[in-house]
Amino acid sequence: MNTVSLNLDSTTKKEVIFMFIGREEELKILSSLLEKPSASAMIYGKRKVGKTTLIKKALENSKDKMVYYECLKAPLQENIDGFVAVLVREKIIPVQLAFKSFNDVFAYLNTLDSTFNIVIDEYPYLKTFTTPETVDSIFQSIIDNHITNVRLFVSGSHIGMMKDLLEEKNALYGRFTVFICLKELDYLTCSEFYRSKSVYDKIAMYAVFGGSPYINCALDERLSLKENIINTILNPSSYVYGYTEHLLISDYTNALNAERIFFAISNGHQKYKEIEEKLGLKTTGNLSKQIDALENMDIISRVYPINKPNDKKKLSFEVKDNLLRFYYAFIYKNKSALQMLGAEAFYEEYIEDSIVTFISHRFEEIARTYFSLCVKKRKLRGVSNIGTFYYDDSANKKNGEFDVVLERKNAYDIYEVKYYSVPMRLKEMQEEERQVRAIKGLQVGTIGFIAASGYEEMPGEYTCILADELYNL
């Protein structure tokens, strides 16, 4: 755990220490480039997922000088001048010389005896006033001709535009030594931000605040879940509130429709038709394009049951970011009440009675991630897929989904996940088993449970996983 920067949270008037946690694989990849005199890397991911911090961490022990430039939403010449100003400040260029292109700047750097680590952050901003093809061609030429003593790190938050750089038709195709799509931290890694908490509380903290390092650094593990919510997401002066209200979708051109889509999905309207009807877009046909754009931003995702992988009728959408989901479930439509009541009263009126249900749904995702980690670490074998499972119980005239299912060669392992504050009872396990056995044609392997507060009994016919096991991989 390493301190990498320091901020002052104006909300709580206390210092917030930004810690570096996780990212071992990504660090290993980027650090390997430091063994070469010349390299190029592309790092992309949604806002505040830790791209810049990762790059700076990878470069902090390099003997070569680092140059960091964050691009502006401005004409190309302004960005060239800004980049040169950074080089002057770092004493790489003696004075502010009048370069007319990025090519000329990098050609000049090639004449120097030193090796440089150069970070071009928010690369898509260079395309604000210049055609994307032109910008990409410029950097293709730079990588091909002018980085013999440069390790170039190109980073960006506009995921769709960054992905385009990897397409065969793009000028930069095949130019990067490595590329990394940086995702949110998983529940296990995030638990390092609040190590002293009980497992029951760790589940709740991740369910609400999610996997952004930027957000997790704002949390105080000495405080309760309620207190952390009040101090951050219910405080309009907090940068956490700003993250949910506008920062995450600041690059999206139709923010209002994005908000309406998030609100619909976060409040149970997860099927395409349901979202379409909720937004009144049924006759326009625009929803599909808007969902595609938000998918490209890594904010929402499509979810198919593992036994219905291409069935559009069974397709549902979910908001991937836990904190964003929380904001649109509880706060978005009630902002005026938050202003009138204050954070504590708002929590008691609008959140307190429903928060356990909210956490329970996210606990299911934690459980699926747990099994995924077990497979990746080779602690669990013979699993071909992990997800939800759609069932049609014709005998009882009902259908639904099992939320945590492992697909094996000839059967499915089915797990029920319970976020209870008390131990799970045997009677409830038996009732869950009856429901599973009632489904005709379902080949069942294991029936199991994951209970946040343990079990009254752990009979041998069931696989009973203790919540502690999720955090001891």
Summary of predicted features, one role per range:
Residues 15, 42, 315-473:
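A cross-kingdom feature that marks ATP-driven nucleic-acid transaction machinery
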Residues 1-345:
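Phosphate-binding site recognition
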